[in-house]
Amino acid sequence: MHAIMLKAKLHRAEVTHAVLDYEGSCAIDGEWLDLSGIREYEQIQIYNVDNGERFTTYAIRGEEGSRMISVNGAAAHKAKVGDRVIICAYAHYSEAELVNFKPRMLYMAPGNELSRASNAIPVQLA
């Protein structure tokens, strides 16, 4: 049996560019790709915190250190500069792989400052 699990997440990153006339994709600061484990051309889901839009695209490498989140092509209709987004990548894992499974999550502060990294989400309290 396989399970589809959250592999990586960039939490509340701010969109820095929305470029309609660009080949579709989402450019992400290369340092964040490396830290999160998201691969270039990997399918990603983007959840727009500000307008509720949810869409699928793929990651491309943005300039390292740029703090870039550029939503490109048709996806530029789903997010505008300044919107806060959650970017997730998922993967299939076998039962054996799940024994040591931990996602990589990067949490962003305003201005796309990396505030912390984690591999677990705290239990939500009632």
Swiss-Prot record:
UniProt cofactor(s): pyruvate
User: Under which EC number(s) is this enzyme classified?
Assistant: 4.1.1.11
A biological process term (GO) from this entry: alanine biosynthetic process
Q: Which domain of life is it from?
A: Bacteria
Q: What molecular functions are annotated in GO for this chain?
A: aspartate 1-decarboxylase activity
Main EC class the enzyme belongs to:
lyase
Q: Does the keyword Cytoplasm apply?
A: yes
Locate the Pyruvic acid (Ser) modifications and list their residues. 25
Which keywords accompany this UniProt record? Autocatalytic cleavage, Cytoplasm, Decarboxylase, Lyase, Pantothenate biosynthesis, Pyruvate, Schiff base, Zymogen
Manner of cofactor binding, per the entry note: Binds 1 pyruvoyl group covalently per subunit.
Q: Hey, which family's this protein in?
A: Belongs to the PanD family.
Describe the function of this protein. Catalyzes the pyruvoyl-dependent decarboxylation of aspartate to produce beta-alanine.
Self-association state and partner proteins as the record states: Heterooctamer of four alpha and four beta subunits.
Q: What is this protein called?
A: Aspartate 1-decarboxylase
